Amino acid sequence: MDWAESQFKTCTHGCDWKKISSDSADNRQYVPCVDSGAGRKSPRKVLLRSIEAVFNGSFSGNNRNVRGFLYVSIRDDDGEMRPVLIVPFGGYGYHNDFYYFEGKGKVECDISSDYVAPGIDWSRDMEVSISNSNNCNELCDLKCYVVCSLRIKE
């Protein structure tokens, strides 16, 4: 069977930063991309086809130039987290008011697993993080959704 004829599945996660910290370690959230093995009767291969991130956020203040990057990283086979998607965000506020930004990005991964035994979950660890380039702080917030597209071949 070709991957195009295989079962399609999505895995969606939400990440919410009520305020962006000046400490980058506080701006990381871990999300797993999972295909459950429960109820499966035969071995399967899993293809992580793509990862898409969509987000919006806001900031407040007067004469503020805000810039940052949203990173989506995936755990590589050697155990290290490596970025696969980097999306810039930001804006400039002239008056003492609230300002909004939004963005999205998508990457085609095509990461295939070996055969996974029935009843065993397949997963890939991912990390969503924010990098502060300029003025991202407690006056900024961001909400993000990450959608992983999977193909399952039995």
From Swiss-Prot:
Principal location class: host cell
Gene Ontology cellular component terms for the protein in this record: host cell cytoplasm; host cell nucleus
UniProt KW keywords: Host cytoplasm, Host nucleus
Lineage: superkingdom: Viruses
Keyword Membrane belongs to the record: no
Keyword tRNA-binding: no
Cellular compartment(s): Host nucleus; Host cytoplasm
Family annotation (Pfam families): Nanovirus_C8
Similarity section: Belongs to the nanoviridae nuclear shuttle protein family.
Function field: Putative nuclear shuttle protein.
Protein name: Putative nuclear shuttle protein
Source organism per UniProt: Banana bunchy top virus (isolate Autralia)
